From Swiss-Prot:
GO aspect biological process, one term: cellular response to oxidative stress
Native organism: Wigglesworthia glossinidia brevipalpis
InterPro entries found in the cross-reference section: Fe_traffick_prot_YggX (IPR007457), Fe_traffick_prot_YggX_sf (IPR036766)
Family assignment from sequence similarity: Belongs to the Fe(2+)-trafficking protein family.
Protein name (record): Probable Fe(2+)-trafficking protein
Length: 78
């Protein structure tokens, strides 16, 4: 059975994620407030950012950059 949540990003009810997609409190917040559809949109945007900015996910600074971009993308009003 699909569970719908009010997605903060989409501003509408959509299917909930199956599990927190990110560790820690940020992952819990995403799980409670972001839909599967919005998470897919973020993953596509994340790929573009990594490629355009030539980020290396083995580098801690680059991972922090993506984390900040993710929070801004999913939770900041447009």
């Amino acid at each position: 059975m699909k569970r719908n949540i009010f997605c903060h990003f989409m501003k509408n009810f959509h299917e909930r994620l199956d599990f927190p997609p990110y560790p820690g409190s940020i992952g819990k917040k995403i799980y409670k407030n972001i839909s599967k559809k919005a998470w897919e949109i973020w993953k596509n945007h994340q790929t573009i950012l990594i490629n355009e900015k030539q980020l290396n996910m083995l580098n801690k600074k680059d991972r922090k950059t993506i984390e900040i971009e993710m929070i801004n993308f999913l939770f900041k009003n447009k």
